[in-house]
Amino acid sequence: MRIVLVDMPWSAIDAPSLALGILKRRVLDVFPNASVDVVHANLDYVDWLTAHTGFTFEEYDFCASSYFSGHSEWIFSAALNEQPHWNVREFNESIGEKVPEPLLAKARELHELAPRFVRDIAARIAAGAPDVVGFTTTFAQNAAALATARAVKSFAPYAATVFGGANCDGPQGAALHRNFPFVDFVVRGEGEATFPQLLTALRHGDGDGDEGDGGSGSSDRDGEGGLSGISGLCWRDSGGRCVANPMEDKPLPPGALVTPEYGDYFDRHARSTAGSWVEPRIVVEGSRGCWWGEKHHCAFCGLNGSFMEFRSKNPQRFVDEILGLVERYRILDVWVTDNILDMAYLTSMAPRLQESGYDLRLCYEIKSNLRREQLRTLSAAGIGYIQAGVENLSSRVLQLMDKGVTGCQNVRLLRDAETVGMNLNWNYLYGFPGESDEDYDAICDQAPALHHLTPPFNATRIKVERFSPYFDQPELGFDELRPAAHYRHIYDLPESELAELVYLFDSRDLGVSPSCLDRLKRAVSGWKDAYLHCRLTHCDLGDRIVLVDTRPGFVWRLLDLTDPLEVAVFRLLDMPHSPASLLRKAAARHEDATEERITELLDRWRHMGIVFTDGGQCIHVAPVAANQDLMRLDGSRLHSAEPLAPALAASPAAPAAPTSAPTPVTVTVTATGGTGGTG
């Protein structure tokens, strides 16, 4: 059996597809004699475009990150709908004010070129006479994958086309199968069990037992063990009727999660133009689901879809998997896809990674209430980049989200990440039902005090996502949902079908007023501009604490705390405290601790930008002095570095990128002086 698995744009060009790596490994385990090839069509697209037109990393990166606007998927809409000028005017009108004209013009050019690329890649896939062609589709891959599946079917009608991935979960998968007849099968849910079962059914569909029947995806094998017995599968019966089997009600146990097989991806990346743009990363998973979401599903989050149940791999097995992949592919940068850190890994997985002796550089998603020593443990294990789900700094808004943290805890994370030298990524989210301008005014007032801490990437209005509580429970505030407007420019489908197919939904704007929103965005923009030039640190010398400040919003530069009460209060403010608890603890050791003095001290420190207050609590914002200048990434300059490999970029195997195209280099500098690209 010949199987081709396809990773279409706009997936990341610095990492292989975890989903396809897992499926390849699983298929080879079940069918050792099968031929399983992965087509890295995202890399092929980069090379194809640089050969046919000017194309830069910034342009690919912009498209890959524009899922919420529909910019990237519209590029493949002409190929999907087989109409060369599909909704060009409508696209310009809907997105023109949001996108700079050069990027808008590039999108129109790519839109015109997309049908040619789709034909080329489909012809190449079909030339290998595959029995099965599988497409993974997550976020902005849908239009490109569907367009290519249509083209593959025209070149090789005998091949069975199969879709899977996050865009196929639940009703989305059934709608995709129902509306696109060139898609023979859709695997909904976790594919490790379902996909091999489908291959078995196809393989037994003809006399010699070697080839699948492919074609229409119809079958009369609807008895026990046939297509009707495969959980979550969408298929067509002998009369052409779409059938959606009930999905599995229990997720796979952690022992069933296999190690991905990435084959020749890293060699292919090195030969691609993308190899001169970004360093590659290994992708792994230690867990699936979300243990916090099992207890308190964050109101806006649609991740995990049908399976929220948290499952994590045995820590030693996970460590062995990471180190095995690192040793095999000779790459130290690792991207962990877990939605949340298994807290047990802090005392199991993390110490074992540290003991490995490798200078690993891992990216991990964590809950934002981790403390400094826990961050140190992760940092020592090589986890230097975190996505922390900070989302907001107002306790009241965080409570509306059901995040399970406070504003002061989030500020503590920003402060302590600066102390231990961890880089982090977060967005400031707004637009929650029940929030008010007052929830943002106090934060905007205090923003200059935080300019030395990692700023949010942006201030972003939430979109309602399928599977989120906001989607499932209209009583929470979003009671008039409709498919996001940009989908109408991509798919030629009625609203009722889009409502089943898509992941994002439009709603009326809720929450903050326009004037407050303008203030928030100005505060975030000012924070981002100031961050690279601002420092605030403290050094605890035992009997005194010295603070050094370079933030332009404050007039002081050096503060020497020598008063025993002030030293004690500052140390207490390492953790969030209410004024009452501060007074109680300080008074237990210092007779001069009075309510008036504590109040005066907190007011003075807030005026100096030393203390952040929210929700009746306060916390100091000064990281421990630890050579922060050596441990920061200058994100504003990542796209202006020299090419990683100019000779490689110009090699015959990989068409040269235009000499004017800036190419990013990300360098992490550790406290010990080691460096390494993180891509």
Residues of each region from the PLM?
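Short amphipathic alpha-helical interaction segments
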Residues: 591-604
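Glycine-rich beta-alpha loop elements in corrinoid/cobalamin-binding modules
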Residues: 2, 9-19, 23-47, 93-96, ...
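Radical SAM [4Fe-4S] cluster-binding motif and immediate context
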Residues: 254-420, 432-433
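Conserved C-terminal portion of the radical SAM core fold
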Residues: 3-6, 326-336, 361-363, 384-390, ...
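Short capping segments at the starts of secondary-structure elements
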Residues: 572-581
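A short, conserved structural fragment
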Residues: 606-617
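Short, amphipathic alpha-helical interaction segments positioned at domain boundaries
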Residues: 617-653, 664-667, 671-673, 679
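C-terminal scaffold of the Radical SAM
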Residues: 438-568
